[in-house]
Amino acid sequence: MVSSTTPSSGEYLLEMSGINKSFPGVKALDNVNLKVRPHSIHALMGENGAGKSTLLKCLFGIYQKDSGTILFQGKEIDFHSAKEALENGISMVHQELNLVLQRSVMDNMWLGRYPTKGMFVDQDKMYRETKAIFDELDIDIDPRARVGTLSVSQMQMIEIAKAFSYNAKIVIMDEPTSSLTEKEVNHLFTIIRKLKERGCGIVYISHKMEEIFQLCDEVTVLRDGQWIATEPLAGLTMDKIIAMMVGRSLNQRFPDKENKPGEVILEVRNLTSLRQPSIRDVSFDLHKGEILGIAGLVGAKRTDIVETLFGIREKSAGTITLHGKKINNHNANEAINHGFALVTEERRSTGIYAYLDIGFNSLISNIRNYKNKVGLLDNSRMKSDTQWVIDSMRVKTPGHRTQIGSLSGGNQQKVIIGRWLLTQPEILMLDEPTRGIDVGAKFEIYQLIAELAKKGKGIIIISSEMPELLGITDRILVMSNGLVSGIVDTKTTTQSEILRLASLHL
């Protein structure tokens, strides 16, 4: 509902002032402010659990604030649903896209508000209006295409176009580039800047510092439910923002390298996946205590390497040798028995059971080993091992019965890593291990990885973040179009050299 209080000066499109919100035993927001100007891109930053989501839920009426005021275009607002917010010009593009995959693009654009001709939907008008918006935003998508046939990046464009169709003045974007290629990211940034030119205020949420400095004008930082600062980005450094987010200065983004790679424990020769296009003739060694990175552009088939090693993909040729003995992993169970573990890329869809507790999520990969002599589960051992995961991985949680979906991304990832360590692996493979994780939690994950390498684990890390690979690995294997284009020593290589190798077979 929009009230008719006195308009503000007009300097801001959106003013959230002194917002407070409490839950039983928890002060989620404590006097928080967010002020967004027209013609601006405003970063909203903070560690997971800082209060960003709660603040936006108060804006959209999903939560009712306890106190504070929200002004939109100078008038006090009190929305009771996201639909009401959208109809009044405030839209959100979620990290998990809200589209009907079986319907056409234009159906998704106008769902619930179809243009009609008499008693029927006016398909021609719907097509024309969709096409006009796409043309204005330089979106090259057929309005009649089925959404399920599109890429993630194209789906995000549709969500943005939908916000545009509502004539949204405030557009909130939550981690919009997490699954995009560099080319797709650049196209997305072009569209965001077009919205800015039209007078929109964009609230941009991302853990990727490089994007924030490339795109945004101002930043608001939250920490532990409190407003810390709102400042122009032009006067800030990455270290300054990190210090505001975590409450202390992070003297280093990556832990010191104390691991000393030993003998070769894994030899991969001419590994080729059965179903092509995929990896072809992949060869490399992995040493005890070594952290081997895998780099490459999107489509380089990096993930196919670890999936083939883990038995998810069937190999058609090549050999896998562990401690001098040839092995074959026909499925995940065989891989686990041979000492392999895989932390998958999509944490929420393939890594965790979000609505089940930490105990279940800690033990699921090893559950058959908890049966006693009569075939019943040994609850005492299960509880003990769950507590080991919580303690050794430094998981921040009230207890092992806590639903894992309620934890931050960093703590979820720690549970997944701990789960695999219970299987006592020799080879730990991590696919995008810090995706969607805030900067403080990233450092904790890096520390865990470094500690595991120091204990002699062979570690393989796939990452799209070049600074991450250069910061924590010993060597980097570079993939290009399913082929190994080079293996480089991290100490002596450069980002430009890795990018050159990544483009070698395109």
Swiss-Prot record:
Binding residues for ATP: G46, E47, N48, G49, A50, G51, K52, S53
SMART domains in UniProt: AAA (SM00382)
Gene Ontology cellular-component terms listed: plasma membrane
Location of the protein in the cell: Cell inner membrane
Claim: Zinc is one of the keywords in the record: no
Classification via PROSITE patterns: ABC_TRANSPORTER_1 (PS00211), ABC_TRANSPORTER_2 (PS50893), MGLA (PS51260)
Pfam families assigned to the protein according to its UniProt record, in alphabetical order: ABC_tran (PF00005)
Principal location: membrane
Enzyme Commission code: 7.5.2.11
Keywords: ATP-binding, Cell inner membrane, Cell membrane, Membrane, Nucleotide-binding, Repeat, Sugar transport, Translocase, Transport
Gene Ontology MF: a single term: ATP hydrolysis activity
Oligomeric form and interacting partners: The complex is composed of one ATP-binding protein (MglA), two transmembrane proteins (MglC) and a solute-binding protein (MglB).
Family under the similarity heading: Belongs to the ABC transporter superfamily. Galactose/methyl galactoside importer (TC 3.A.1.2.3) family.
Name this protein carries in UniProt: Galactose/methyl galactoside import ATP-binding protein MglA
Organism of provenance: Escherichia coli O6:H1 (strain CFT073 / ATCC 700928 / UPEC)
Designated gene of the protein: mglA
